[in-house]
Regions:
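Surface-exposed connector loops and short turns at secondary-structure junctions
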Residues: 3-6, 160-187, 211-236
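N-terminal beta-strand block that forms a small beta-sandwich/beta-barrel module immediately after a flexible targeting
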Residues: 10-54, 58, 220
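Surface-exposed patches in structured soluble domains
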Residues: 32, 47-54, 58-64, 114, ...
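Amphipathic alpha-helical coiled-coil/rod segments that serve as protein-protein coupling scaffolds
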Residues: 24-26, 57-135, 155-157
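Extracytoplasmic
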Residues: 26-28, 35, 43, 123, ...
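Short, charged beta-turn/beta-strand-edge "cap" motif at the junction between a beta-strand
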Residues: 65, 72-73, 180-183, 240
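Short, solvent-exposed secondary-structure boundary/capping segments
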Residues: 41-43, 196-207
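N-terminal export/targeting signal detector
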Residues: 1-25, 175, 224, 235-240
């Protein structure tokens, strides 16, 4: 899932490129932890019967998370199934046209599909971050019901000046620190270096102006224990 970096946010972040100087004299670049988030939406209209998982619960791909009450759809599916069974016998006996047979088969399959939509399942493994609706609420197709995040690997964007960029390359290992946990140290790696500069005049003419160039760098972190969570501030120390 591609993340876009709004220009306004880049400009704001660029003003705070270097958060602080570490004890060893190394600069640390500030970033905010992000994760791949997947929104789950209703595909049918109905009343929420119940949530099958709570916020913060781990979930598996294909796991049912939300049940929508749709007895009317189940009733319609039962009728469509019975009609098709009768149609099969008539078709075999030559008493029903192929057109009518196909129409009843489609109605049966369509009704069964809508019944499956009564249960909202997670398409990915991860953790249920947010539930946006309550039991008993009426929802319609497209309404966002929940968000699941894959926390097994997270990332942060940092912004480095032009002079520093030359020494960086994708795959390079870096150190990161979590201020909220007493400067706990984590290993990370540079996954993407974005080629377009930000926070600088469009027409750079002098060497002094080039020092104002900053580039977005995506740093990824394995997060097996899920210690790093979206929204946390992380400080990245680049190799010399």
């Amino acid at each position: 899932m591609k993340k876009l970096i709004p220009a306004a946010l880049i400009a704001a972040a660029a003003a705070l490129i270097v958060l602080k100087v570490g004890g060893g004299g190394d600069f640390r670049y500030s970033g905010t932890i992000e994760a791949t988030e997947t929104d789950l939406s209703a595909r049918i209209s109905g009343v929420i019967d119940r949530y099958l998982a709570r916020e913060g619960d781990p979930v598996a791909a294909g796991e049912a998370l939300i049940s929508i009450d749709c007895d009317d759809l189940r009733l319609a599916a039962g009728i469509a199934s019975d009609d098709f069974r009768r149609a099969e016998e008539l078709f075999k006996a030559g008493s029903l046209s192929r057109e009518n047979y196909d129409r009843l088969k489609y109605r049966r399959d369509d009704s069964a599909l809508k019944v499956r939509w009564c249960t909202v399942k997670s398409p990915v493994s991860g953790r249920l971050l947010y539930s946006y609706r309550e039991k008993g609420e009426l929802v319609s197709p497209g309404v966002k019901l929940a968000t699941v995040a894959d926390l097994s690997e997270v990332w942060a964007y940092i912004y480095v000046p032009h002079d520093t960029l030359a020494g960086l390359k994708p795959g390079m290992e870096v150190k990161a620190f979590l201020p909220e946990a007493g400067d706990m140290e984590f290993a990370g790696r540079i996954s993407v270096i974005y080629p377009e500069a930000e926070f600088t005049p469009k027409n750079v003419q002098t060497r002094k102006e080039r020092t104002r160039l900053v580039y977005a760098v995506k740093v990824s972190f394995p997060n097996k224990g899920e210690t790093l969570k979206p929204g946390m501030t992380v400080e990245v120390e680049l190799p010399e």
